[in-house]
Amino acid sequence: MPSPLDASSLNRFRGAFTAIVTPFSADGSRLDFARLEEQIAFQKQGGVTGIVIAGTTGESPTLEEGEYRELVDRGVALAHGLGLLAIVGTGSNSTAHATHLQKTAAKAGADAALCVNPYYNKPTQDGLIRHFLAMADAAPLPIMLYNIPSRTGVALTSETIVRLAQH
């Protein structure tokens, strides 16, 4: 189980974080890592605290396994090389897949994980709790809950968030 975050650890996440897009080649056949590097450098010049890699804006549900892993590895390394924090989207509608993505992000050195509610299957609040606890236990990364019910079909309640925060 991850250790609780203290106030000084949470202070690292103050400031602006940009959810970056995942750049592809002109024909869409491969990731464009030169453009990724340019994009992250541009964010640094803009004064952000960090970036979000492989979030919804970053095409996370459509990336193949190898693409996701390489994007996360390179994106985290580029961000850290510029002194930026890197939050990685690890959400999925499958708990097994989400925990796998959580481990991938941790291995890459991500500073935190952005975890969306499982989409399409509309879990109960107890189902959401089990899903997010499995993610928390999969890797020692702080988790940021991404509650977007218009896209996932289910909203986290404040009671559920309180229960998760006690983990």
What are these regions (language model features)?
Residues 2-155, 161:
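Active-site beta->alpha loop and helix N-cap motifs at the rims of alpha/beta catalytic domains
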Residues 160-167:
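Active-site/ligand-binding-proximal alpha/beta "capping" segment
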